[in-house]
């Protein structure tokens, strides 16, 4: 249970029972962020699954009238990408926190918490990048939360878990998040190609790509990527960005053989994701 002032609302992505919430186990408990306050709450459905959007903060000019429809379109496009009519989670809570400066998100089994810059929303590309971030975290319902490297399950809370598969988890997702606004009808092909070109250019302009391999970038994430130094750019490369570039190359190669990376991801979901089997 959560005790809060009467004029506050409390939101937890768990099954509600009476005056509180029920977690199936410790993993589910610590994976469920609690938000309480005078929050703007919007409810919507994606292919008949209940979704909740919590908004903490707002752009100076307010949210565009199309915002909720745009979010729904990106979510539905993600489901189509995965070839599964319903989302992977039976309920989903999306939390968006606006700050003066910020960018990022963290996925959970039944939702995600994002932070983003309200200043960035003043430009069209900033709004598009927010939708891409939402798509990125939404896709993690499948790729990461349920389809994941074997070493990430069961959870080990006592030490850092080392996995070369992080590049697949985040790189594949980063590649597809660029396409989700296109698939959702919220951007066009030239814009997608421009965004992809920018992402590839960032990799090309990172000297560290000649020093650190993609698998090493993933394996050394906790000791290098998240502990940046003045020389990091010259000695390291992000497994997100190099992973996305690698995903693009894989997609092109597969398409030349009458397949695609999305088809591969759907096959992996069927063979390893639905059953929560980790992959190697």
List where the protein language model places each region.
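Juxtacatalytic substrate-recognition/specificity segment
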Residues: 40-166
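Amphipathic alpha-helical substructures
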Residues: 190-195, 222-280
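Active-site-adjacent structural elements in folded domains
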Residues: 97-100, 157-160, 219, 225-236
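An acidic intrinsically disordered interaction segment
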Residues: 130-145, 195-220
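Extracytoplasmic/secreted proteins, especially bacterial periplasmic and envelope-associated proteins
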Residues: 66-73, 77, 129, 133, ...
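Intrinsically disordered, low-complexity linkers and stems that provide flexible hinges
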Residues: 1-52
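Post-HExxH zinc-binding segment in Zn-dependent metallohydrolases
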Residues: 112-121, 146-147, 158-209
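Acidic/polar loop patches that form or flank catalytic/metal-binding clefts of enzymes
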Residues: 10-11, 87-90, 150-151, 183-193, ...
